Amino acid sequence: SHHKPKLQINITTGKWHCWVSNQGGHNLFQLFKKVGASNEHFSELGGLVDDIPKYKRNTDTSKEVVQLPKEYKPLWNGGDSIVKRHALSYLYKRGITDDDILRYDIGYCDDGLYSNRIIIPSYDSDGKLNFFVGRDFYNGKMKYRNSPTSKDIVGFDLFINWDEPIILCEGVFDAMAFKRNAIPLFGKTVMKTLQKKIIESRVKIIYLALDNDAIVDATKISEYFINNGIKVKMMKF
């Protein structure tokens, strides 16, 4: 019947399905990415999702399951506390905007194992959680306490356009600062899953943005991809 909806969206769970293309997904950001939404549209989404719980759990039992800490609270949504204010202050000082907070689903914990940490999730191309970073915002002895799961993933895959040049950088804050097509390595080496994705996606140009103390690592990465027919450009800071 012509009354059947062409696009169905559950704003409570974020799940969507297009009856024309028979495609579906787990969250609204994935849908926005598919239709080529601009940054302005992502900002507008911010005004709509105030009370929508975001996708937080990967229920795929065939792989290692990544879960956000149970104490995780989104920074873009409701509530106020001194800890939340300090978390936001830390992010603003590092150049992270409200749009970034919404786009990357950034949250925080004020209790538990990840207490006083900003939580930055990473989602795969299907919108499933594949890793998260926990950064202490009171500058305690242990700066980072990350997901206990493997780093052998593609960081921020949900936001990557593989038809364009990509940027490889060390951390999530670097990746967010670049604003466009940047993949955090969660370190100084390119893991197998990311290597494979880059080769299979036929990426033509890689911009390598490692810290100055990582010359040896950068050279190894560069040689590997050049040997695979990919142009590599070093970025200096």
Positions of the model-derived regions?
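A generic structural motif
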Residues: 46, 231-237
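TOPRIM metal-binding catalytic domain and adjacent DNA-binding surface shared by DnaG-type primases
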Residues: 1-4, 33-119, 123-126, 160-161, ...
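Short, aromatic/basic amphipathic alpha-helical patches
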Residues: 217-229
